[in-house]
From Swiss-Prot:
It comes from the Eukaryota. Keywords: Cytokine, Disulfide bond, Glycoprotein, Immunoglobulin domain, Secreted, Signal. The keyword Signal applies. This is Interleukin-12 subunit beta. One of its GO terms (molecular function) is cytokine activity. PROSITE patterns: FN3, HEMATOPO_REC_L_F3, IG_LIKE. Residues 1-22 form the signal peptide. It is found in: Secreted. GO terms for biological process: interleukin-12-mediated signaling pathway. Heterodimer with IL12A; disulfide-linked. The heterodimer is known as interleukin IL-12. Heterodimer with IL23A; disulfide-linked. The heterodimer is known as interleukin IL-23. Also secreted as a monomer. Interacts with NBR1; this interaction promotes IL-12 secretion. Residues 23-106 form the Ig-like C2-type domain. It comes from Felis catus. Glycans are attached at residues 135, 223. GO terms for cellular component: interleukin-12 complex; membrane.
Length: 329
């Protein structure tokens, strides 16, 4: 084929290729319109269809305007800004036939907006969702922060793998009583509990779990994603039942503890390692820290001090638990 013919054929393919989907259904009768967000953007042409066998005497209205917007079974609108979103309803006489609700997902300079959630600055990457698991049962908790109080809705979806996804069930997002203060501002904390349906605690993970949060504020839509292996988000509960036993003719004491009840069993397979530290008066920490695999240690315990113990998976460098403590006095 002549080079000029190749160029013409390639151009034909480009022109005939279907455009990227700029509007898609989030849930029944709710649609997301994806917009390039800059003053010169043309917006998106959206065709709404009235869900009725009727053909005649159909009119359209929206919750943004009291005027009749058009007539007929379909309505074509140009969506350029939030004033063009909202609920569109088709009527016949005084009867409502159906409605469609339009949300806007903004893209500025090629980047999807992240206005609804607060970035959690704990790594080099932008993180909006944080997830933790107390053990290898496949159950985990995710949370996020927002400064927004009203007109807010979250929906959470999760699966492991994409080609043949394994089911992960998530509950409803709930507002925590805990307020989180960041940069002198209080943020609301939302949490969700998820459970992998066919989790095998001892199995090696080959595919990550993906969590997607659909966030809606008024007429704005955003989504946030986190992808991880359970082993990477493990954070045990603190050790339990800390006890001190004085040692004869010694300044040392023996501190002992037990595995947390929520940790995976058997402990001979799902083993923990422990960090032990003496904290002095006024919460001053001694620099030396013991690392032990057994559930006891000998330390010097001064008056007014306390001993702290935390736990971590012995064979994988995931997160340490919070501290458990016992007073020396």
């Amino acid at each position: 084929m002549h080079p000029q013919q190749l160029v013409i054929a390639w151009l034909s393919l480009v022109l005939l290729a279907p455009p990227l989907m700029a509007i898609w259904e989030l849930e029944k009768n709710v649609y997301v319109v994806e917009l390039d967000w800059h003053p010169d953007a043309p917006g998106e042409m959206v065709v709404l269809t009235c869900n009725t066998p009727e053909e005649d005497d159909i009119t359209w209205t929206s919750d943004q305007s009291s005027e009749v917007l058009g007539s007929g079974k379909t309505l074509t609108i140009q969506v350029k800004e939030f004033a063009d979103a909202g609920q569109y309803t088709c009527h016949k006489g005084g009867e409502v036939l159906s409605h469609s609700f339009l949300l806007i997902h903004k893209k500025e300079d090629g980047i999807w907006s992240t206005d609804i959630l607060r970035e959690q600055k704990e790594s080099k990457n932008k993180i909006f969702l944080k997830c933790e698991a107390k053990n290898y049962s496949g159950r985990f908790t995710c949370w996020w922060l927002t400064a927004i109080s009203t007109d807010l809705k979250f929906t959470v979806k999760s699966s492991r793998g994409s080609s043949d996804p394994q089911e992960v069930t998530c509950g409803a997002a709930t507002l925590s009583a805990e307020k989180v203060r960041v940069d002198n501002r209080d943020y609301k904390k939302y949490t969700v509990e998820c459970q992998e349906g066919s989790a095998c605690p001892a199995a090696e993970e080959s595919l990550p779990i993906e969590v997607v949060v659909d966030a809606i504020h008024k007429l704005k839509y955003e989504n946030y994603t986190s992808s991880f292996f359970i082993r990477d988000i493990i954070k045990p509960d603190p050790p339990k039942n800390l006890q001190l036993k004085p040692l004869k003719n010694s300044r040392h004491v023996e501190v002992s503890w037990e595995y947390p009840d929520t940790w995976s069993t058997p402990h001979s397979y799902f083993s923990l390692t422990f960090g032990v530290q003496v904290q002095g008066k006024n919460n001053r920490e001694k620099k030396d820290r013991l690392s032990v695999d057994k559930t006891s240690a000998k330390v010097v315990c001064h008056k007014d001090a306390k001993i702290r113990v935390q736990a971590r998976d012995r064979y994988y460098s995931s997160s340490w638990s919070n501290w458990a403590s016992v007073s020396c006095s």
